[in-house]
């Protein structure tokens, strides 16, 4: 029952948040030229797509596959994270030389510790050990759960073939990773573990002392992150480890928060050459992520697009002797994403109003709506309400109704039909009178 309840809550949260505008509204190129093959940035407070570059382009998922393993774990076992399991020997060969957290077979771990290993070190053994244990050794069954849940979340370009990302058949895209991360962010345990710059793994059967797992997300650590560090970074994961002597592309999926505004950043297939920080371990996707993070938080803020205390429009009023017009006010200030250096006046307002309103009117009555656009994209629709009571003048109302009746189609039809009937009746009477005046012929009979 708890699993079902957790699943329902998670999907309610997800569906309430995923109504997105048609396209991205902003371009970072004046500040930074994105080199990734694809990217997707969304403000989760407003669901506004801030930046979109080939976001549906399918790419290799690599280590990001662990996000789907975590999604299955948290959907079904969120209340059992402190339960223990033994790292199975059966997965040893599969993860050989990729066991980034040194979690050895037959050692005992909690599922929460496995989460820390996955999210700090991208540990393949943690993902495979969790999947093997919870699926009762049926890894294909676990992968089937991953694909089923992925589709329920809304992904369209993702395919999962193992629990950790070693297999090259794991594919995804920037939009899909946004959906998956946003789903995961609905779990408190995920948010807490993702934000840890390090984790102390307790001593185990084959480890006499505890060990410290330092997060590969260098942006989380002020002490060791160097130029990558950003206080706004809340958590994230890379598809591959940092480059040193080799080359390639890298993807990073993360989220940041500053001054109450939250954004998800999905940067896919950044070339290693784009990292110009100069460290021996190059992190190109994280480099581009923090550059885009700087651009977003420096350029935009959540502001009120409308002032509910100011008149936004006027509309003619009929049947009132007190006023000819009615002042309209927005029913909501509509907090939205706007350039930091401007205010709500940068939006374009498109009013949807009747030609006039008729008294009586009560303050607060909804009269119409205003559609707000920014850079050609609709950012919201707000109701417009009456700013004051307007009483009806009975005389004006009566006179207008008489005029309305006298000019109505109904009266015109009645008059025309009456005229036609009168003409027909007149013709009939004329014919009848004519027939009466005509002399009758006498009939003579022979005898």
Task: Give, region by region, the residue ranges found by the protein language model.
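Positively charged n-region of N-terminal signal peptides that target proteins for export
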Residues: 1-8
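Generic structural signal for hydrophobic residues
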Residues: 9, 145-146, 288, 292
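C-terminal segment of classical bacterial N-terminal signal peptides
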Residues: 14-23
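Short secondary-structure junctions and interdomain/linker hinges
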Residues: 15, 125, 299-303
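Membrane-water interface at transmembrane helix exits
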Residues: 15, 74, 131-132, 428, ...
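Active-site-adjacent loops and short helices of periplasmic peptidoglycan-processing enzymes
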Residues: 22-175, 179-188, 193
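Domain-terminus/edge residues, biased toward the C-terminal soluble/receptor-binding domains
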Residues: 155-156, 168-176, 181-446
